[in-house]
């Protein structure tokens, strides 16, 4: 098997997982370099970069690189690809060729994001890309358009990956294995994939409307034509809040396995409680988004609802934390470095 055949045309979940891990490591170094620039600018009085726009571009790029090209490829693409088939005894992922495409959409997406920083004045909008700052008035030129296309590609990659993981986790188990016998990491990736499948299309819609506002004279987010910039915020945060749970849920799964192993236990405390806590967190994550928007002004009843719903998430999260503590309790703890 030639090098090209193995790495470019792979249909092997382990090879594709390795590609994801390597890509994530490289992107992580880019993201770290960007955060170093941020700290260098803020770590002393006066200016270092000397230009507010450049600083905002660095902050925006740092966020996108770390979220879409480091955490998600490593946690979902890397660990997910490597571990999910192994943990359920499947020969590979449900759709191995689509798995390959999910990975190879990421380098072009990364390239578009880097390009967005180098043309015109860059994307100095913050990772939220709110209009009217992201409009063709405040950000003329191709920068924001390139960033939008970058997000489109990363989004397609993640949606395809999500379909793959959902199908694999549900359908590729041996007949004797019920869903409630799969390891917690498999559950965490399954729930993460469901969140991706439900939230990313909304982001795609929002940024596509922003794209047409910028280039095709639509006014989805422009009051002059009957639009509303607040609509963009709702669309963005309906994705943006589940996204932060997408980033942390695979970590919850990993922590459960790590804690059980280092406590010398064969399983974590309260398996069913852990599963339902993750399911609850995933569900509740979709009905709290407007807490990111309190400063734009909201009805008192709306504020009360979003505040209460947000606080409810603390309950399943607490179940997870105390189950980890209960797993450690009474264990023969391995103090490996």
From Swiss-Prot:
Cofactor dependency: heme; Cu cation
InterPro entries for this protein: Cyt_c_oxase-like_su1_dom (IPR023616), Cyt_c_oxase-like_su1_sf (IPR036927), Cyt_C_Oxase_1 (IPR000883), Cyt_c_Oxase_su1_BS (IPR023615)
A Gene Ontology term for the protein's cellular component: respiratory chain complex IV
Annotated binding of Na(+), by residue: 41, 46
Catalytic activity entry: 4 Fe(II)-[cytochrome c] + O2 + 8 H(+)(in) = 4 Fe(III)-[cytochrome c] + 2 H2O + 4 H(+)(out)
SUPFAM superfamilies per the UniProt record, alphabetical: Cytochrome c oxidase subunit I-like (SSF81442)
Metabolic or biological pathway, per its Swiss-Prot or TrEMBL entry: Energy metabolism; oxidative phosphorylation
Quaternary organization: Component of the cytochrome c oxidase (complex IV, CIV), a multisubunit enzyme composed of 14 subunits. The complex is composed of a catalytic core of 3 subunits MT-CO1, MT-CO2 and MT-CO3, encoded in the mitochondrial DNA, and 11 supernumerary subunits COX4I, COX5A, COX5B, COX6A, COX6B, COX6C, COX7A, COX7B, COX7C, COX8 and NDUFA4, which are encoded in the nuclear genome.
Protein name according to UniProt: Cytochrome c oxidase subunit 1
Gene source species: Tinamus major
